[in-house]
Amino acid sequence: IEMGDVWGNNSVLSSIGPGGVFAEAYACVPGEPLMVNVTAAEDTRALLLNIRRVLEPCANVCPRHVRLVRNLLTLCSEKNLQLSRRVLHTGPKSIRKRLLSYFSECIKRTGSYSFDIPYNRQQLADYLSVERSALSNELSLMQRDGLIRYEKNHFDVMEQIDS
Protein backbone atom coordinates (compact mmCIF):
# COMPACT_ATOMS: atom_id res chain seq x y z
CA ILE A 1 0.00 0.00 0.00
CA GLU A 2 1.54 3.26 -1.13
CA MET A 3 0.63 6.88 -0.78
CA GLY A 4 1.59 9.12 -3.67
CA ASP A 5 1.58 12.87 -3.97
CA VAL A 6 0.58 14.92 -7.00
CA TRP A 7 4.25 15.13 -8.11
CA GLY A 8 4.63 11.34 -8.37
CA ASN A 9 6.53 10.73 -5.13
CA ASN A 10 5.50 7.48 -3.42
CA SER A 11 5.78 6.40 0.17
CA VAL A 12 5.18 2.77 1.17
CA LEU A 13 2.76 2.59 4.06
CA SER A 14 2.60 -1.17 4.46
CA SER A 15 2.56 -4.52 2.74
CA ILE A 16 -0.23 -7.07 2.92
CA GLY A 17 0.03 -10.82 2.69
CA PRO A 18 -2.55 -13.47 1.83
CA GLY A 19 -5.84 -12.94 3.65
CA GLY A 20 -4.99 -9.31 4.35
CA VAL A 21 -7.44 -6.43 4.31
CA PHE A 22 -6.97 -2.97 2.85
CA ALA A 23 -8.96 0.27 2.50
CA GLU A 24 -11.33 -0.67 5.33
CA ALA A 25 -11.03 2.81 6.85
CA TYR A 26 -12.12 4.35 3.55
CA ALA A 27 -15.06 1.95 3.35
CA CYS A 28 -16.21 3.02 6.82
CA VAL A 29 -16.04 6.76 6.07
CA PRO A 30 -18.29 7.45 3.06
CA GLY A 31 -17.10 10.23 0.77
CA GLU A 32 -13.50 10.16 2.02
CA PRO A 33 -11.19 10.55 -0.99
CA LEU A 34 -8.90 7.55 -1.49
CA MET A 35 -5.36 8.68 -0.65
CA VAL A 36 -3.55 5.37 -1.24
CA ASN A 37 -2.69 3.05 -4.10
CA VAL A 38 -2.68 -0.71 -3.76
CA THR A 39 -0.42 -2.69 -6.07
CA ALA A 40 -0.25 -6.48 -6.19
CA ALA A 41 3.22 -8.00 -6.51
CA GLU A 42 1.73 -11.26 -7.82
CA ASP A 43 -1.57 -12.60 -9.15
CA THR A 44 -4.23 -11.65 -6.63
CA ARG A 45 -7.93 -12.05 -6.03
CA ALA A 46 -9.82 -9.50 -3.93
CA LEU A 47 -13.12 -9.87 -2.12
CA LEU A 48 -15.15 -6.66 -1.97
CA LEU A 49 -17.51 -6.30 0.99
CA ASN A 50 -20.54 -4.06 1.33
CA ILE A 51 -19.52 -2.35 4.57
CA ARG A 52 -23.03 -1.08 5.26
CA ARG A 53 -24.28 -4.68 5.40
CA VAL A 54 -21.32 -5.69 7.55
CA LEU A 55 -21.84 -2.91 10.10
CA GLU A 56 -25.61 -3.31 10.35
CA PRO A 57 -26.13 -6.80 11.80
CA CYS A 58 -29.13 -8.84 10.76
CA ALA A 59 -32.05 -9.25 13.16
CA ASN A 60 -30.73 -12.66 14.22
CA VAL A 61 -27.29 -11.28 15.18
CA CYS A 62 -25.81 -14.53 13.90
CA PRO A 63 -22.44 -15.66 15.33
CA ARG A 64 -20.75 -15.48 11.92
CA HIS A 65 -21.70 -11.84 11.52
CA VAL A 66 -20.46 -11.01 15.03
CA ARG A 67 -17.20 -12.82 14.24
CA LEU A 68 -16.80 -10.90 10.97
CA VAL A 69 -17.24 -7.55 12.75
CA ARG A 70 -14.84 -8.62 15.53
CA ASN A 71 -12.24 -9.71 12.96
CA LEU A 72 -12.54 -6.43 11.05
CA LEU A 73 -12.14 -4.44 14.28
CA THR A 74 -9.04 -6.49 15.13
CA LEU A 75 -7.60 -5.86 11.65
CA CYS A 76 -8.27 -2.12 11.94
CA SER A 77 -6.53 -2.07 15.32
CA GLU A 78 -3.53 -3.97 13.97
CA LYS A 79 -3.27 -1.58 11.04
CA ASN A 80 -3.45 1.40 13.40
CA LEU A 81 -0.52 -0.07 15.35
CA GLN A 82 1.40 -0.70 12.13
CA LEU A 83 0.97 2.90 11.00
CA SER A 84 1.90 4.15 14.48
CA ARG A 85 5.13 2.14 14.30
CA ARG A 86 5.91 3.67 10.91
CA VAL A 87 5.53 7.14 12.42
CA LEU A 88 8.01 6.12 15.13
CA HIS A 89 10.49 4.82 12.52
CA THR A 90 10.35 7.97 10.40
CA GLY A 91 10.66 10.33 13.38
CA PRO A 92 14.46 10.16 13.78
CA LYS A 93 16.35 12.61 11.59
CA SER A 94 19.21 10.32 10.51
CA ILE A 95 18.82 7.33 8.22
CA ARG A 96 20.84 5.18 10.63
CA LYS A 97 18.49 5.96 13.51
CA ARG A 98 15.48 5.22 11.30
CA LEU A 99 17.01 1.89 10.33
CA LEU A 100 17.86 1.05 13.94
CA SER A 101 14.30 1.90 14.98
CA TYR A 102 12.93 -0.40 12.28
CA PHE A 103 15.44 -3.16 13.06
CA SER A 104 14.58 -2.91 16.76
CA GLU A 105 10.92 -3.53 15.94
CA CYS A 106 11.87 -6.50 13.72
CA ILE A 107 13.98 -7.98 16.53
CA LYS A 108 11.16 -7.55 19.05
CA ARG A 109 8.60 -9.00 16.64
CA THR A 110 10.66 -12.05 15.65
CA GLY A 111 12.48 -12.56 18.94
CA SER A 112 15.72 -12.85 16.97
CA TYR A 113 18.56 -10.61 15.82
CA SER A 114 18.39 -12.47 12.49
CA PHE A 115 15.28 -11.78 10.40
CA ASP A 116 13.83 -11.18 6.96
CA ILE A 117 11.98 -8.01 6.03
CA PRO A 118 9.07 -7.84 3.56
CA TYR A 119 10.63 -5.04 1.50
CA ASN A 120 13.20 -4.67 -1.25
CA ARG A 121 15.58 -1.67 -1.03
CA GLN A 122 13.26 0.77 -2.81
CA GLN A 123 10.27 -0.28 -0.71
CA LEU A 124 12.29 0.00 2.52
CA ALA A 125 13.49 3.45 1.46
CA ASP A 126 9.92 4.49 0.72
CA TYR A 127 8.71 3.04 4.04
CA LEU A 128 11.37 5.01 5.95
CA SER A 129 10.89 8.12 3.76
CA VAL A 130 14.50 8.28 2.57
CA GLU A 131 16.23 8.14 -0.80
CA ARG A 132 17.13 4.62 -1.92
CA SER A 133 20.75 5.50 -2.71
CA ALA A 134 21.20 7.12 0.71
CA LEU A 135 19.61 4.08 2.38
CA SER A 136 21.90 1.69 0.50
CA ASN A 137 24.92 3.80 1.42
CA GLU A 138 23.96 3.81 5.11
CA LEU A 139 23.38 0.04 5.09
CA SER A 140 26.87 -0.41 3.59
CA LEU A 141 28.37 1.85 6.27
CA MET A 142 26.55 -0.03 9.02
CA GLN A 143 27.86 -3.32 7.62
CA ARG A 144 31.40 -1.91 7.36
CA ASP A 145 31.13 -0.73 10.98
CA GLY A 146 30.17 -4.27 12.03
CA LEU A 147 26.66 -3.30 13.18
CA ILE A 148 24.79 -5.47 10.70
CA ARG A 149 25.21 -8.10 8.02
CA TYR A 150 22.70 -8.36 5.23
CA GLU A 151 21.94 -10.03 1.96
CA LYS A 152 18.90 -8.90 0.01
CA ASN A 153 16.07 -8.77 2.57
CA HIS A 154 17.77 -10.89 5.27
CA PHE A 155 19.45 -9.03 8.13
CA ASP A 156 21.67 -10.03 11.04
CA VAL A 157 21.92 -7.25 13.61
CA MET A 158 24.64 -7.27 16.25
CA GLU A 159 23.29 -7.54 19.78
CA GLN A 160 25.38 -4.63 21.07
CA ILE A 161 24.99 -1.38 19.19
CA ASP A 162 25.89 2.08 20.44
CA SER A 163 23.37 4.29 18.69
Q: How would you describe each model-predicted region?
A:
Residues 25-26, 71-79, 93-95, 138, ...:
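Long cytosolic regulatory regions associated with cyclic-nucleotide signaling
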Residues 83-95, 110-116:
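Short, Lys/Arg-enriched, Trp-marked, Pro/Gly-tolerant hinge/linker segments that flank
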Residues 58, 62-69, 74-88:
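Inter-domain helical "communication" segments and dimerization helices
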Residues 1-8:
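Cytochrome P450 core scaffold surrounding the K-helix E-X-X-R motif
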Residues 98, 102-163:
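Phosphate-/nucleic-acid-contacting segments
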Residues 12-70:
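Cyclic-nucleotide recognition modules
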Residues 19, 38, 80, 99, ...:
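Short hydrophobic/aromatic patches on the structural cores and recognition surfaces of FHA
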